[in-house]
Amino acid sequence: MDFDINNLMQQAQAMQEKMKKMQDEAANAEVVGESGAGLVKVTMNGRHDVKGVDIDPSLMSEDKELLEDLLAAAVNDAVRRIEKQQQDSMQNMAGGFPFPPGFKP
C-alpha cells in the first residue's frame, strides 16, 4: 500500500475548510434549554451566549430560590445541548477523513 502525501495534504486542506464551515455553523446554531417541564426556557447560541430567557408567568408568584434554581437548570440544559450538537457535528466531519491505521479521531 503506497502512501500518497499529496493526496493526504489535499484531504487535510479539504478537512480544514470543512472545519471552518462547521465552526461558523456551530457559532450560529441555537438551542433551547428547558427546566420545570418547560416553565423556564433559555435560548443559547454556539458561542454559549444566552440570546433569550422565557419564564412562564405562573412562576412569578413562586419564591425567588425556586426561580433561580429553574433558571440555572435551563442554562445548564442549553449548554449540554449545544455541546452535544457540536460533538455530533465533529464526529460526522471526522468520519469522512481517512485516518492512518491505528489512529482514532
From Swiss-Prot:
Transmembrane segments: none annotated. The keyword DNA-binding applies. GO terms for molecular function: DNA binding. It is found in: Cytoplasm, Nucleoid. GO terms for cellular component: bacterial nucleoid; cytosol. Residues 85-105 are annotated as: Disordered. Keywords: Cytoplasm, DNA-binding. Binds to DNA and alters its conformation. May be involved in regulation of gene expression, nucleoid organization and DNA protection. Homodimer. Belongs to the YbaB/EbfC family. This is Nucleoid-associated protein ABO_1774. It comes from Alcanivorax borkumensis (strain ATCC 700651 / DSM 11573 / NCIMB 13689 / SK2).
